[in-house]
Amino acid sequence: MAPFPDEVDLFTGPHWRMKQLVGRYCEKLSNTNFSSNTDFLALLQSLYETFKEFKMHEQIENEYIIGLLQQRSQTVFNVHSDNKLSEMLVLFEKGMKNNEYEQLNYAQQLKERLEAFTSDFLPHMKEEEEVFQPMLMEYFTYDELKDIKKKVIAQHCSQKDTAELLRGFSLWNKAEELQKVFKYSVDEKIERDSKNRKSSASICNLPPEVMLNIFSYLNPQDLCRCSQVNTKWAQLARTGSLWRHLYPVLWARGDWYSGPPTHLDNEPDEDWISRRKDESRAYQEWDEDADIDESEETGEDDPSISVAQREKELLNSLVHYILPYIGHSVKTLVLAYSSATSNKVIRQILEYCPNMEHLDLTQTDISDSAFNGWCFGACQTLRHIDLSGCEKITDSALEKLSVALGMPLAHKKRLLKCYRNNRTVKDIRNQMRCGSLAQITGESGIYSDYSSSQIWILNSGNLGDIEDAADWKFRTTDGLGVLEMTPNLTCFSNGCCSRAVPGRWTNVIRQEHCKAAPLNYCGHTLCGNTLRTIQALPGSNIGTKTLQSEIRDICPGSAKLDQQVARVLQFLSLSGCHQITDHGLRVLTIGGGLPNLEHLNLSGCLNVTGSGLQDLVSACPSLNDEHFYYCDNISGPHAATASGCQNLQCGFRACCRSGE
């Protein structure tokens, strides 16, 4: 607010003097030695004189300013009714009569009372300047205000002590001039500093980096609570780095651990597992009954059902409210021994979390359909997968896993190099007879048990001799060379080869297989797709198409996959998955095998043979024999150094000797 003209500003000059007195007694109060009786009495005497001047000042304002204003405005009343000046004077008089033993207690009381008075007196003066001065300008004429000011100054100067301190009226006028410049600076600075302290003290105004660091110390439950405070906190609480490791089973039971999965390496005891199985059984029975009769009790009285319900609600909340925001940052998901996990929930979680590295589904009631959402390269970063005790898992799940692990760049280059060579069919066939099949296809001879002939699709402009192709069934349609499979060929019934030949794909089929394009050229030793070259369709202005160009045409995003790592799986446990066969083991060798696999547990896989094990082990060069487990009844690879079966005398997982 701009200062009023000097001639009619009734408050600025006297208030400047009052503020000067406040500053003086505050300084004396801080410098006084209260243990010294002399200093203490000197302070009280100074305070007594100061507050007498305060009281005189208030009396002058009441008589010459506020009293006149009340006569012209009914809104002004009781302005100085609670200034506590008289009470303060009584306090000072009482202090002068105290003895030395009472001084310290009195000093503390004095400081508190002075601090309270100061906090009221300064705003009171500011109110007079900002509220009553404009009212005076409204209800009085200019000349009337000039006369009032002269009377006010005369009354203040009539006091001997005041007149001496001000050194006459001229000094007062100089003070007024200065006050016009600094009138509101002190109070505004105090108010501004107070606001700054208030705003800076608020945790909501901390930088996002600091808030994120604070949130990193919170558990998932606390993060969810913080997300309900405001929009800013909700966004920070959904930061991916805070949700790298998910343990819904533990969280549902009150354990909010969210660190790396290192402490979960040890198997729980049978009692703990038995309790989890009882929970799952009780929940399933209750769930079935609830579907039939919804009027029955909710089952909250049963602790097992209550825990399973909490787990189910927690999983649903994760899927719907958290994973859509942080799914790409999730590295670990542990659902071991879950009572409420379903195929649908797992499928949704895996779709949201493409960068998963650690997946533990031990002893859950899932089946192959849980992995239906996996397409080519969907989990290229997966390093640890534990399916122990998942009795419904079959070879189909391993096919999906092999597809989702992708294909290493080095393996792709080797296949493409094989496509680009100009060798004749006779040369290839001769090399196959010499046993160099791995050099041609990049795969080991995993299908040596089958007698089907090798089948190649070649460019129609570069066909082999009729003698070499005598056993082939080959037809040409408008210059397009397409090789049809012979009836006696055995291949995956549900695998990547049971589909139309690439040269005859329609637009619909191309769209359907777009995501899995790189595995359409699987490199199976039976399918021989590693030597396929396709001539352009009739009417096309493109020349001969290689595998690489066809992949780019069908799935333009596949170029990015070449730059990523793939098939980095290090830990695979299928313990107790008794429906797994050699076929499931062999599909894991496709696309480059498992070059980083160190831990392989096939305990309780009753339907695999030594041949299937050998094919898989040959594609796992990093396998550690100490962490290689399979049934003792199987004559398999590394029989002398492998660790054997882990499920002996195990009451909750399949084992060929469980009856012993």
UniProtKB/Swiss-Prot annotation:
Binding residue positions for Fe(3+) 1: H15, H57, E61, E127
Binding site for [2Fe-2S] cluster: C631, C645, C655, C656
Protein name in UniProt: F-box/LRR-repeat protein 5
Function statement: Component of some SCF (SKP1-cullin-F-box) protein ligase complex that plays a central role in iron homeostasis by promoting the ubiquitination and subsequent degradation of ireb2/irp2. Upon high iron and oxygen level, it specifically recognizes and binds ireb2/irp2, promoting its ubiquitination and degradation by the proteasome.
Family annotation (SUPFAM superfamilies): F-box domain (SSF81383), RNI-like (SSF52047)
Start and end residues of each stretch annotated as Disordered: 283-305
Cross-referenced Gene3D superfamilies: 1.20.1280.50, nmb1532 protein domain like, Ribonuclease Inhibitor
Comment field on protein domains: The hemerythrin-like region acts as an oxygen and iron sensor by binding oxygen through a diiron metal-center. In absence of oxygen and iron, the protein is ubiquitinated and degraded.
Region feature (Hemerythrin-like): 1-157
Needed cofactors: [2Fe-2S] cluster
GO terms under cellular component: nucleus; perinuclear region of cytoplasm; SCF ubiquitin ligase complex
Keywords: Cytoplasm, Iron, Iron-sulfur, Leucine-rich repeat, Metal-binding, Nucleus, Repeat, Ubl conjugation, Ubl conjugation pathway
Gene Ontology biological process terms in this record: intracellular iron ion homeostasis; protein ubiquitination; SCF-dependent proteasomal ubiquitin-dependent protein catabolic process
Chain sites annotated for binding Fe(3+) 2: E58, E61, H80, H124, E127
Start and stop residues of the LRR repeats: 311-337, 338-362, 363-389, 390-417, 551-576, 577-604, 605-630, 631-649
InterPro entries assigned to the protein according to its UniProt record, in alphabetical order: F-box-like_dom_sf, F-box_dom, Hemerythrin-like, Hr_FBXL5, Leu-rich_rpt, Leu-rich_rpt_Cys-con_subtyp, LRR_dom_sf
Molecular function terms, GO-annotated: iron ion binding; iron-sulfur cluster binding
Subcellular compartments: Cytoplasm, Perinuclear region; Nucleus
Quaternary structure and partners: Part of a SCF (SKP1-cullin-F-box) protein ligase complex.
